[in-house]
Amino acid sequence: EAATDRFAAMINIGYLPPEEEEKLVNFDFKQVRLNPLLSKQRIIQLRAVISQGVFLHQRLGRYIQRLVAATRPYNADTDWRHHSPSELVETGVDLGASPRAIICWSRLAKVWALLQHRRAEVYPEDIQELAPFVLGHRIWLGPHAAAHGLTAEAVIADVINQVPVP
């Protein structure tokens, strides 16, 4: 789980159609010439704009923290002795999201607010829209969950529904 936790978000792009996959067999990748979309300087500028120019209210930062904490089931054998408001987490999750999810989610929320919604402030909806991408690969379901058809998506939706929006 530590390896997947290092990725900020997971986006499932699916597979190519079989006829496109067949083209990969003899494709000459050396002939591909990519043109950069952004210069290094522009990326540095955008990072500064997002970091300093997009506002994430402290109450929304706490909301992110509570959402991440709610993905973790109570475990008397560890230092995590808090019950999740989600019954799906308590019965189906073996391992919830780590604190790294908080860092990634807060940064991605700023990017999302600016690029997706053209806003200089993060709203709760931004956080909620990103939840499947930030949490999906960080929630490890137990055998009970798999046996009953529980999915990470269902757990995430329940966590979003159970944690009050500030």
Task: Describe the residue ranges of each PLM region.
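Short, well-structured alpha-helical interface segments that form or flank functional binding sites
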Residues: A2, R59, C104
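Alpha-helical scaffold elements adjacent to nucleotide-binding pockets in ATP/GTP-utilizing enzyme cores
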Residues: A2-R6, K23-L24, D126-L130
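Short glycine-/polar-rich loops that comprise or flank the Walker A/P-loop
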Residues: T4-A9, G136-H137
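Conserved C-terminal "switch" segment of AAA+ ATPases
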Residues: M10-E87, L115, R119-A120, P124, ...
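C-terminal engagement/docking regions of AAA+ P-loop ATPases
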Residues: D77-P166
